[in-house]
Amino acid sequence: GGTGGTGGTGGNGGAGGSGGANFNGGTGGTGGAGGDGQNGTTGVASEGGAGGQGGDGGDGGEGGGAGFGSGVAGAAGAGGNGGKGGDGGTGGTGGTNFAGGQGGAGGRGGAGGNGANGVGDNAAGGDGGNGGAGGLGGGGGTGGTNGNGGLGGGGGNGGAGGAGGTPTGSGTEGTGGDGGDAGAGGNGGSATGVGNGGNGGDGGNGGDGGNGAPGGFGGGAGAGGLGGSGAGGGTDGDDGNGGSPGTDGS
């Protein structure tokens, strides 16, 4: 089967407006979420297509500058969340005495966007976006008469979290944004079949957490995906591994 298309990239957040005298600047816009990957197509008596990769989240917009007098700068925009990876296609049905096709692997989740840097006195950096979840593995194809079921496809890996924005300013430094959490890995596909069931696919690995900006904290690690179940006597797939935590800012 054919491979699913790649998800679209999230849009960048808009810049916050400048504050007037004694007023705060406007908050930067949040980056748009990445588009979902397209599903893989179903294979015909063959292996299912792999899911497409989720789109990356857009970076956050810059915060507005400080107003005249004692105005305070606006907060920087957060990064957009990564898109979910596409699901793998189902394996094709086997002919007589032949096994079904293997399911396609799930697509990787998109990475979270980076938070924007703070601008001006006491301007906080934006938070990093969360990584997208990995796509689900496609189910194994049905075995033909006397044929075994196909293997389930592996789950996609979670996307990495975005980094928090760096605080900047000529006066007191603002606080850095937190790193985004990584997306969870996708589940392995279940095996099916008229004869003996095929083995379930392995779960995808969780993505790594995003790194914090100076002063910020690293994002949490994504959870590993669940292994697919082996129906009809097949072996269950292995669970995916969790991602590594993000690094704290200094």
Enumerate the predicted regions with their spans:
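Collagen triple-helix signature
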Residues: G1-G249
